[in-house]
């Protein structure tokens, strides 16, 4: 999978997209067949997949956290399953946020592990077994929708309303991971994140296919005002411009920005440059929670950068407060029906 999306993926299709179309056609055929024909294993406990149609971020991790919090409010014991992208460990691992580093397990699993039991595993089937053995009542899988390894009891596809599905073309012409028709066949519902219009075409297509569409937005959890504060905003996430927009919405004055690739591990020079530029100019450093967890205390000046940076925390809030509960109920009902079918066929 492509790790960094080129900018032309997110604009109207141009000659570059069309020049790569033959490769996209082949990629789409393979990806679509894999989704439709692969033999999928079943989980011993209900499994919700939080996925997206495209390469890059769409808000899956904060959405997964919102669903987990709703599950805990219902007295369930949710757990997260992640591939651990960006981490070096290639064995099934129960993530310990006090012990593991982003280099070990990836940045997103560290955020998830602060909320609930989290396992990373290259083979998601093994990860699901591990979580069931650990006593999870419901598994929330962050990403992995196109992997075709597990049966989903509910597949919620997150679409960023500001980006939609980009130019609508398949990798490598565009950001789409598999033909939308194939993906919709395996989706249970869509979540439109935000109130922009870029996602509307795919949302309408999903509605015509009979898929429920939920709406939510990311909201800031403010810990003190940034109004009028001059800042240097830095981030290494899939959509840094979206983060910079969020910073502006706090009332902060962005004097400088620094963008890094998603899941980027910062070098000593990069860390020093951020600290020194902000200090010399009197700017406040601001970043994301996902970036902070990639800074390793005791590793050069990383701890200093973490201490000097204000984190803009966000969470996902559904327009319908009952929506997360409905998703959980549907997943539990689907799992019961699945187990009944398995019992009858066994």
From Swiss-Prot:
Keywords, sorted A to Z: ATP-binding, Kinase, Lipid A biosynthesis, Lipid biosynthesis, Lipid metabolism, Nucleotide-binding, Transferase
Which EC number(s) are documented for this chain?
A: 2.7.1.130
| GO MF | ATP binding; tetraacyldisaccharide 4'-kinase activity
SUPFAM superfamilies with a match to the protein in the record: P-loop containing nucleoside triphosphate hydrolases
Q: Which reaction does it catalyse?
A: a lipid A disaccharide + ATP = a lipid IVA + ADP + H(+)
Gene Ontology terms describing biological process: lipid A biosynthetic process; lipopolysaccharide core region biosynthetic process
Main EC class of this protein? transferase
Q: Does the keyword Transferase apply?
A: yes
Q: Which Pfam families match?
A: LpxK (PF02606)
Q: In which pathway does it act?
A: Glycolipid biosynthesis; lipid IV(A) biosynthesis; lipid IV(A) from (3R)-3-hydroxytetradecanoyl-[acyl-carrier-protein] and UDP-N-acetyl-alpha-D-glucosamine: step 6/6
Question: Keyword Glycosyltransferase on this protein?
Answer: no
Amino-acid positions noted as binding ATP in the UniProt annotation, renumbered to this chain: 54-61
- Listed GO cellular component terms? plasma membrane
Which InterPro entries does the protein's record reference?
Answer: LpxK (IPR003758), P-loop_NTPase (IPR027417)
Name the job this protein performs: Transfers the gamma-phosphate of ATP to the 4'-position of a tetraacyldisaccharide 1-phosphate intermediate (termed DS-1-P) to form tetraacyldisaccharide 1,4'-bis-phosphate (lipid IVA).
What does the similarity note say? Belongs to the LpxK family.
What name appears for this protein in its UniProt entry?
A: Tetraacyldisaccharide 4'-kinase
Q: Which organism is it from?
A: Sinorhizobium medicae (strain WSM419) (Ensifer medicae)
Gene this protein is translated from: lpxK
């Amino acid at each position: 999978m492509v790790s960094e999306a080129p900018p032309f993926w997110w604009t109207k299709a141009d000659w570059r997209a069309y020049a790569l179309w033959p490769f996209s056609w082949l990629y789409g055929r393979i990806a679509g067949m894999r989704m439709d024909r692969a033999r999928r294993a079943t989980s011993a406990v209900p499994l919700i997949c939080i996925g997206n149609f495209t390469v890059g971020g769409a808000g899956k991790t904060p959405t997964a956290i919102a669903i987990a919090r709703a599950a805990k409010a219902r007295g369930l014991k949710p757990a997260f399953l992640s591939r651990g992208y960006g981490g070096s460990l290639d064995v099934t691992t129960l993530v310990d946020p006090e012990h593991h580093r982003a280099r070990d397990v990836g940045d997103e699993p560290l955020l998830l592990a602060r909320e609930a039991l989290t396992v990373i595993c290259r083979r998601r089937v093994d990860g699901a077994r591990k979580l069931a053995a650990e006593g999870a009542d419901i598994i929330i899988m962050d990403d992995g929708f196109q992997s075709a390894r597990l049966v989903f009891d509910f597949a919620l596809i997150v679409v960023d309303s500001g980006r939609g599905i980009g130019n609508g073309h398949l990798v490598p012409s565009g950001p789409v991971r598999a033909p939308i028709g194939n993906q919709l066949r395996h989706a249970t519902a869509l979540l439109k994140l935000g109130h922009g219009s870029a996602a509307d075409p795919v949302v309408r297509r999903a509605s015509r296919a009979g898929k429920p569409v939920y709406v939510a937005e990311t909201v800031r959890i403010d810990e003190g005002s940034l109004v009028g504060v001059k800042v240097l905003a830095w981030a290494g996430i899939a959509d840094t411009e979206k983060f910079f927009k969020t910073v502006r919405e706090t009332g902060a004055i962005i004097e400088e920005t620094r963008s890094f690739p998603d899941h980027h591990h910062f070098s000593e020079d990069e860390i020093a440059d951020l600290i020194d530029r902000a200090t010399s100019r009197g700017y406040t450093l601001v970043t994301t929670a996902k970036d902070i967890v990639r800074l390793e205390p005791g590793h050069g000046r990383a701890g200093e950068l973490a201490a000097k940076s204000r984190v803009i925390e966000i969470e996902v809030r559904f327009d319908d407060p009952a929506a997360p509960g409905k998703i959980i109920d549907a997943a539990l009902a689907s799992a019961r029906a699945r187990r009944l079918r398995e019992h009858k066929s066994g």
